Amino acid sequence: MGPRALSPLASLRLRWLLACGLLGPVLEAGRPDLEQTVHLSSYEIITPWRLTRERREALGPSSQQISYVIQAQGKQHIIHLERNTDLLPNDFVVYTYDKEGSLLSDHPNVQSHCHYRGYVEGVQNSAVAVSACFGLRGLLHLENASFGIEPLHNSSHFEHIFYPMDGIHQEPLRCGVSNRDTEKEGTQGDEEEHPSVTQLLRRRRAVLPQTRYVELFIVVDKERYDMMGRNQTAVREEMIRLANYLDSMYIMLNIRIVLVGLEIWTDRNPINIIGGAGDVLGNFVQWREKFLITRWRHDSAQLVLKKGFGGTAGMAFVGTVCSRSHAGGINVFGQITVETFASIVAHELGHNLGMNHDDGRECFCGAKSCIMNSGASGSRNFSSCSAEDFEKLTLNKGGSCLLNIPKPDEAYSAPSCGNKLVDPGEECDCGTAKECEVDPCCEGSTCKLKSFAECAYGDCCKDCQFLPGGSMCRGKTSECDVPEYCNGSSQFCPPDVFIQNGYPCQNSKAYCYNGMCQYYDAQCQVIFGSKAKAAPRDCFIEVNSKGDRFGNCGFSGSEYKKCATGNALCGKLQCENVQDMPVFGIVPAIIQTPSRGTKCWGVDFQLGSDVPDPGMVNEGTKCDAGKICRNFQCVNASVLNYDCDIQGKCHGHGVCNSNKNCHCEDGWAPPHCDTKGYGGSVDSGPTYNAKSTALRDGLLVFFFLIVPLVAAAIFLFIKRDELRKTFRKKRSQMSDGRNQANVSRQPGDPSISRPPGGPNVSRPPGGPGVSRPPGGPGVSRPPGGPGVSRPPPGHGNRFPVPTYAAKQPAQFPSRPPPPQPKISSQGNLIPARPAPAPPLYSSLT
């Protein structure tokens, strides 16, 4: 966030200074050194004035925000500056070497550096990057032009040289493209119908609203160090200025440059810099992978060389910014200024960020030429094509490391709320007040989380809350990659890891290399479509032995190198069964070579000498039994240092990742895959949420309670008619049974009469001791009541003694019989004494 506009008092004082002529060019005060201006086609000598409330004062080390007035190009420019607190981390490191070649490390105090960034008042989307250590030295980017400013040598009046950047004379630098392509691109840049750079900025920021951060590491070679008088402090300050300029260029794409480290080869160059640019680049990225990246984490490393390569300004890999093995570039820093050199580094770093050359494409940047012009024009503006290329990289999940916002302990220690970097003491930083209006998680005025928020940014943060442990935050991209998961207590996704280089893949026909399974068929299909496949070995030998642009094994100096027979499979890729033209957005040159009954297809993308050709065989490709391609040579696969003992270390239930830790299969637990678990590794994060069982419990309740109940309800609804009928039938049967039971208990019912001797036994009429019912002979009465016949005297205990029942209420049959007592049958009981003889009734005849 820059300083505020001038107060009325300051504006009045400014007009007074202008009226007195104190801010105009001071040509008579001093003359520029010829060596300082010989490379400039035009310039002005100016005296910047620092704006304060009362008087001009010297720049102090504690100045966080300053403003200057510059009168140049017939206009008055008021620039507002603030110290670039994002430029250097608190743990900024400088590596050097002693005379014995031993590595030395130093953490210089950079908390009070004098490198500033800012803007020009009244100029929309302007950017300023200057060093105020000894005068003002840096760049001013206006609407459609860029200017340089630097102190005038031997001046005692604070005089400076102010010059347009496109007016610098320099040795032509090229990237190997034809003049026709360069002229075509230059013509396109002059077309008036193209939108302004302001419109470009608005459009890009709408597409890429999330800021990316490039953690840059710079390496300076021995010759450049000697050229600077073997002064480590001077080299360090020069590279910090370089990083500040880069930051001012990339900010238009919403990309920030953070210089995380510097290495100066003070004793000797640890790599061979003899040969062509491709050779040196290959040597540098191999050294980086083996030594530098193991010492200090970074996203891209750029080598600064004094040596030139026949007019080639530099070289870098395309789209490899987060790669462990290819995220690097080389840059020639000869007899040019740091401001001019910044455009070269911005160009090569742009290749790492997925940007191709603008040549031959409909590109515009609001200037005559753009940064990604292959002619290394010294422009300060990125084109619409560069923005689109970077957008494609991000949409294809490339550059994931750029979302790694520097953590508070890695950021510059002087906090600045509103710079979109989380400084020490801050929990979040949403930027300007306007940007914070749409941030739901962060309080812009305090850079603290809102009361309900757990986080405000990161791959494992959603709706201001941590994603649950086990949530995948980085998916698996190939059979040689592994996924990463959130841990439930951090907004950051774990660092990207993959299966260790050298692990067999594609049914043991290839090796894993940097997270990809490298084999010829896959490379042919990427270029020529899904039906293409690798050509026979004879094709590789015949084509790559020629040593031209369509068949070679890299460069030897500025010339193509012929492939030896043993290295032919590591040169230009040769394919057959080609039915589709290349699927790349850039149309390459295609060559077809007949060879022994087949057609060998190859391509040359003409990307320039600063970009490795995608038509070459990929490094890590299996070129023979136990061998891989490395730097255009077929070498033993032992260079991959694969040492994973799957059976011993991972117990046969996992593989080793790039950190040489076991990544376990599903069902086994890290770190050694010897116990039951959920898979993953100590590097990937938990593959499940060990603390939360809500999902599991919910599923159990759903499947074992809710689902059965719903199924039962559906069954009952479908069978409701049948069930209703069955229920009615059962109820009717039960009712009938009760009615029959009631009828059986009716008094005087002849059907239930029993003889005294037991159930279902009737006695002949007129027998001894049997009374006859009033209804006629042959009808027996129930025993036990009055009028029940008893055995005659003298029979003793021949018959059981009846038990008399309680008196029952009177019954009224349809045909009333005479009143009769009712007794119940008691079965065969043995009385304790003989019962009295029952009374005898005579029939009513």
Curated annotation (Swiss-Prot):
The active site is at residue 348. Binds 1 zinc ion per subunit. Residues 644-698 form the EGF-like domain. Residues 414-501 form the Disintegrin domain. It is found in: Cell membrane. Changing residue 202 to A: Does not affect shedding activity. Gene3D superfamilies: Collagenase (Catalytic Domain), Disintegrin domain. It is a single-pass type I membrane protein. Disulfide bonds join 322-401, 363-385, 365-370, 473-493, 644-656, 650-662, 664-673. GO terms for molecular function: metal ion binding; metalloendopeptidase activity; protein kinase C binding; SH3 domain binding. Metalloprotease that cleaves and releases a number of molecules with important roles in tumorigenesis and angiogenesis, such as TEK, KDR, EPHB4, CD40, VCAM1 and CDH5. May mediate cell-cell, cell-matrix interactions and regulate the motility of cells via interactions with integrins. This is Disintegrin and metalloproteinase domain-containing protein 9.
